[in-house]
């Protein structure tokens, strides 16, 4: 077992953190060697397995990420932009693969990740599932095939606790549509229309967000023209798909050169 890649999960007490730890524990290709929480969390100092309501697993939750990362070959990180930037620096010091599922990263955050990627492998994606990454490829292909008479809209739905909008996945799909159109998403993007907005701007890519209940994640890419419509859709019913994808990325990155990668690279799409 000790020759298997060691994985550290950050944000251990969160829903995704717990799912990630369970996924690693259930795997015969990796081992859980660390769990990180923010200072002051009631989980710090507790056995991670017991904190999740199960049997002890011999991994104590810590608020010292550098100590945890030093014994790991990979870090899986679904936290906040500020925490992720800090973890990227520490993972680079430890030369650990850093798998990032955190969303809401701005250009300043991305610049810091670029620096960290000079020293370690970073795999970053707005969504780690196979289905969504296939949808991303399809979105680009359809956008390439259709002319400007087809309007593009991205509609996403998530649970009431999600704090950012549009979702990272929605933006990933929008980027794919923009690439297919040969345009820049920053110029084409229109988010959350309200009031008297006037006619739709030609070439724009619209985003709408729904928040409610316990929706895991739903994404529609709509291509609409006069008299017809194409809808590409992905529905996630279990966040375990993201955890499995993240673990796959952590294992894939073990023999790669430092740099930034995404799930398209991991999946070979």
Curated annotation (Swiss-Prot):
What is one cellular component GO term in this UniProt entry? cytosol
The reaction(s) this protein catalyses: (S)-2,3,4,5-tetrahydrodipicolinate + NAD(+) + H2O = (2S,4S)-4-hydroxy-2,3,4,5-tetrahydrodipicolinate + NADH + H(+); (S)-2,3,4,5-tetrahydrodipicolinate + NADP(+) + H2O = (2S,4S)-4-hydroxy-2,3,4,5-tetrahydrodipicolinate + NADPH + H(+)
Sequence positions that bind (S)-2,3,4,5-tetrahydrodipicolinate: 159, 168-169
Positions binding NAD(+) in this chain are: 11-16, 37, 101-103, 125-128
Question: EC number(s) per UniProt?
Answer: 1.17.1.8
Gene Ontology biological-process annotations = diaminopimelate biosynthetic process; lysine biosynthetic process via diaminopimelate
Name the top EC class. oxidoreductase
Task: Tell me if DNA damage is a UniProt keyword of this record.
Answer: no
Question: Chief subcellular site?
Answer: cytoplasm
Q: Where in the sequence is the active site?
A: 158 (proton donor/acceptor), 162 (proton donor)
The record's annotation in SUPFAM superfamilies points to: Glyceraldehyde-3-phosphate dehydrogenase-like, C-terminal domain (SSF55347), NAD(P)-binding Rossmann-fold domains (SSF51735)
Q: Where in the cell is it found?
A: Cytoplasm
Keyword annotations from UniProtKB, A to Z: Amino-acid biosynthesis, Cytoplasm, Diaminopimelate biosynthesis, Lysine biosynthesis, NAD, NADP, Oxidoreductase
Transmembrane segments annotated in the record for this chain: none
Q: Name one GO molecular function term.
A: NAD binding
| Pathway membership, UniProt | Amino-acid biosynthesis; L-lysine biosynthesis via DAP pathway; (S)-tetrahydrodipicolinate from L-aspartate: step 4/4
**Residues involved in NADP(+) binding:** 38
Matches recorded under InterPro entries: DapB_C (IPR022663), DapB_N (IPR000846), DapB_N_CS (IPR022664), DHDPR_bac (IPR023940), NAD(P)-bd_dom_sf (IPR036291)
Family label: Belongs to the DapB family.
Function of the molecule: Catalyzes the conversion of 4-hydroxy-tetrahydrodipicolinate (HTPA) to tetrahydrodipicolinate.
Name assigned to this protein? 4-hydroxy-tetrahydrodipicolinate reductase
Q: Which organism is this protein's natural source?
A: Cereibacter sphaeroides (strain ATCC 17025 / ATH 2.4.3)
- What gene is behind this protein? dapB
